[in-house]
Swiss-Prot record:
Gene coding for it: hifA
Annotated localization: Fimbrium
UniProt-listed PANTHER family: FIMBRIAL SUBUNIT ELFA, FIMBRIAL SUBUNIT ELFA-RELATED
Pfam families per record: Fimbrial
Assigned protein family: Belongs to the fimbrial protein family.
Protein name as it appears in the record: Major fimbrial subunit
Disulphide linkage map: C42-C82
Species, as recorded: Haemophilus influenzae
Main location: other
Amino acid sequence: MKKTLLGSLILLAFATNAADPQVSTETSGKVTFFGKVVENTCKVKTDSKNMSVVLNDVGKNHLKTKKDTAMPTPFTINLENCSTTTTTNNKPVATKVGAYFYSWKNADENNEYTLKNTKSGNDAAQNVNIQLFDANGTDAIEVVGNGTTDFTHSNTNDVATQQTVNKNHISGKATINGENNVKLHYIARYYATAQAEAGKVESSVDFQIAYE
């Protein structure tokens, strides 16, 4: 009888330890992720994988006030292997392609998600960032940074649902129309975060091909 009771107690203890731990709902939560992989196979051409864009010198009087911009400078990201993909077995195929610009270090969330001037020292310009635009020169690109919240929403009644994001941050979108090569056009400008002080400006941003 004692052996049977001891065995039962051991089994009960094991079952209790094996169960999911009870965590306070006030100090815990869950994040559900949604996404999609498409059949498209665009690649960044070699000449666009590591580019430099040089903006012409500009007088500081062009950048007197916060949000002033100057010296629109075009640049292009070249893609290849973008011929139209035929869907098979109802697999998803995108009809548009663009670039997703992001930087965990340089995106300035306090200044419209422009790119911070990373040049340091006595010869660095002050209060000057770099802002990116789509090819029309009017649609500003918000570089995705740590503070970007457009991809997140709260679930109703604790049910995870896939909703349309506020902004997908796919810039310079071009239609995939059967041509192998696709060009994504953009514009860079100086951007004043306050009254500019003369000096050098330098920054960088990462990008990845994204589909819609």
